[in-house]
Design a protein with these regions (language model features):
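Conserved helicase motor core of P-loop NTPases
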Residues: 423, 431-439, 443, 456-460, ...
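Intrinsically disordered, flexible peripheral segments
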Residues: 1-339, 344-353, 369-372, 384-394
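Conserved glycine(s) of the Walker
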Residues: 477
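Pre-P-loop entry segment of helicase/translocase ATPase cores
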Residues: 380-459, 464, 530
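P-loop (Walker A) phosphate-binding loop of NTP-binding proteins
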Residues: 473-474, 501
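Conserved P-loop NTPase motor core of helicases/translocases
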Residues: 491, 495-565, 593, 604-607, ...
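Short hydrophobic/aromatic beta-strand immediately N-terminal to the Walker A/P-loop
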Residues: 468-471
Length: 650
């Protein structure tokens, strides 16, 4: 993702852009900022930014009259949002190495892409206000944006990027100036990024005939820029990636798994901030271009020749026909359905932009409008709207939704997703109601060192019922409980097989419980192989107990596949996990739903900690009780300091 939105707070929030940004990277060579947006037009703000006018807007005042634009800001009030658009490195290299015409076209392509995204954001801008005792979300009549284009990174590599500073004041339909409801741009940074990159590609392809590599997560580099050139001019990226690698390594060590896409995005944001160097002063853009050319020549003639020859390869290509539009919608829906049970319309726009062919050559404004129309059409014809019903007679926004519904609250899904979830729920109902729980273990292990919760959970794991649900918080003795249950099943001559989210976790599960175990993926794959039956070790007899460890991490589709296999082979299933620990990689959430709606046993006594207070505190922390931090602080368990000091202390 290369569009990031940063919240700007405090009285000095605007000074960085007028006093420090123009000379922080280059010696006065950066262009002045300019105004953008219908909100700016309402204030008479056009063309080049006057620093005093910009500071007035960021202070929440009309630059002409000095009057407050709505409620006066407090000392720490949010003043605006910096949406930073950063071009792929190959585009910046193309700018750095091009002649005047090439540089002009690259800059225009970048600017048109930024403006197209800002136009999309403006059309979706809202404000919140109280009306008749209710908080409502109404359309804003424009936004006020200060646009500042820059050409280098903090390490003085070529890096074409733009700071679009969106003021936290928007005009409402009644003429008042109110706060921007920024939830959309904050939540949908990935949508802004996908739109920017799709538009940048179409503009550069249209203007210069540029060809592209295959996009990854919606981002693509120019095809004929060699990797060694990209690496040479990516010092800042290397800094961030090195820091990100350290963070991911610690994440894996602490949690025993890879971060999800959302978790990785958060780690990347932290890495960007942690690795940020002091801003340099110094050379002019002309001087830097000479240096950049020398660095390219030092890589060899091949890299120089590649840069000079990457123009004009894709000229003459056209737009998107109806058949391509259908394929785009299918691809976007498939991508969303893999990872989410429901999504917002903006997320659909994001996926459509990400899968837009790199050969498209329509104008960026036309492309953005097309993607929005395609998303609207898909939402009305191919999805089910599961948002809260609108009250009768409620006024509607431009998007056709009631003003009582926040823009971020609308939820869409597909019939197939709902059907899959409903089938799992029905399967769970049938499985739990079929046979009464087997309770002999309660007597057998009454003196075996287990607490009552563990005894109950072990009894459930060894029952004759077709489905059992066990909630096991960290440190609550889950492994001991399962080992006891497995021993009892073996003693009765009953088959048992364990599955875990990773091969390493499955190996630990097998070692600590004494049962055969593998990954859920492996078990499913063995029974879905098109050309051979399952391997003997996976050909489990009827009555086998399948223990699914860390069931909260299992994707819904995989649980549904397991349910079908269990019915087909007459297996019983025990789902064990903690929905408050790990989330599914992919579309999940069914384990959490099942334990809320079906009979479940919960291990409620923590054994991992030596002190009783910490056992209780860990359960409060798991439940999300913020007041438990007071207990940790009172016990001297909270420590602070710089990042370096904290690492040293650990």
């Amino acid at each position: 993702m290369t569009v990031r939105v940063t919240t700007l707070k405090g009285a000095d929030a605007g000074r960085y852009y007028t006093e420090r940004l123009p000379s922080y990277y280059l010696d006065g060579d950066e262009p002045p900022g300019r105004w953008w947006g219908q909100g700016a037009d309402r204030l008479g703000l056009r063309d080049e930014i006057d620093p005093e006018a910009f500071l007035a807007v960021m202070a929440g005042q009309d630059p002409t009259t000095g009057e407050d634009l709505g409620r006066r800001y407090g000392e720490e009030s949010v003043r605006g949002y910096d949406a930073t658009f950063s071009a792929p490195k190959s585009v910046s290299v193309r700018f750095a190495r091009g002649d005047e015409e090439i540089q002009r076209e690259v800059v225009l392509a970048h600017e048109r892409a930024v403006e197209a995204v800002l136009g999309w954001a403006e059309s979706h801008a809202h404000t919140r206000l109280r009306r008749r005792g209710h908080i409502v979300c109404e359309d804003a009549e424009g936004i006020v944006v200060g646009v500042f284009r820059q050409h280098t990174s903090r390490r003085l590599d070529p890096q074409l990027h733009t700071h679009a500073v969106i003021a936290n004041r928007v005009p409402a339909h009644d003429g008042r100036w109110l706060a921007l409801d920024a939830r959309t741009i904050k939540l949908d940074q990935r949508t802004l990024s996908a739109l920017y990159h799709a538009n940048l590609r179409t503009e550069l392809t249209r203007r210069l005939g540029v060809g592209w590599r295959t996009p990854e997560h919606g981002i693509a580099e120019i095809a004929d820029v060699d990797d060694d050139v990209l690496a040479e001019f990516s010092q800042r990226t290397h800094d961030v990636q090195r820091r990100l690698g350290e963070k991911i390594g610690r994440f894996r060590a602490d949690l025993g798994r890879d971060p999800t896409e959302k978790e990785r995005w958060k780690l990347e944001r932290e890495a960007v901030l942690d690795s940020r160097p002091a801003k340099p002063h110094g050379p002019t853009l002309t001087e830097l271009r000479r240096e950049w050319r020398a660095r390219v020549r030092a890589l060899g003639r091949g890299s120089e020749r590649v840069i000079q020859s990457m123009i004009g390869r894709q000229r003459g290509l056209e737009g998107i026909d109806s058949g391509t539009a259908v394929l785009l919608a299918d691809a976007a829906i498939g991508s969303l359905a893999e990872s989410q049970s429901s999504w917002r319309p903006a997320e659909l726009v994001r996926e459509l932009a990400a899968v837009t062919p790199t050969t498209v050559t329509v104008d960026s404004e036309q492309l953005t409008e097309f993607l929005q129309r395609l998303a609207d059409h898909a939402a009305s014809t191919r999805y089910m709207d599961i948002s809260r019903p609108a009250p009768a007679g409620m006024p509607l926004r431009r998007d056709g939704r009631p003003i009582t519904e926040a823009a971020v609250d609308r939820a869409l899904t597909t019939e197939s997703i709902l059907a899959e979830e409903e089938q799992l729920i029905a399967w769970s109902d049938r499985r739990q109601g079929a046979v009464s729980p087997h309770t002999r273990l309660l007597t057998i292990d009454s003196n075996g060192g287990l607490n009552p919760g563990q005894v109950e959970a072990a009894a459930a794991a060894t029952s004759a019922r077709g489905l059992e649900l066990i909630v096991g918080p960290a440190g609550a003795g889950k492994t001991t409980t399962l080992a006891t249950a497995v021993a009892h099943l073996h003693m009765e001559g009953r088959s048992v097989f364990g599955v875990a989210p990773t091969a390493a976790a499955a190996e630990v599960l097998a070692t600590e419980t004494g049962m055969l175990a593998d990954t859920l993926d492996k078990l499913l794959t063995e029974h879905h192989h098109p050309h051979r039956p399952a391997e003997p070790s996976y050909s489990l007899p009827p009555g086998t107990t399948i223990i699914v460890d860390e069931a909260g991490t299992a994707a819904t589709t995989k649980l549904a596949d397991l349910a079908r296999l269990a019915d087909q082979h007459d297996w019983r299933v025990v789902l064990v996990g903690d929905p408050r620990q790990f989330s599914a990689v992919g579309r999940g959430g069914m384990f959490a739903h099942l334990i809320e709606t079906h009979a479940a046993v919960e291990l409620d006594q923590v054994h991992r900690f030596r002190h009783q207070w910490e056992r209780q505190a860990s359960l409060r922390l798991r439940a999300g009780d913020p007041n438990v931090l007071t207990e940790y602080e009172r016990r001297g368990r909270l420590h602070g300091g710089t990042l370096g000091h904290m690492h040293a202390d650990i």
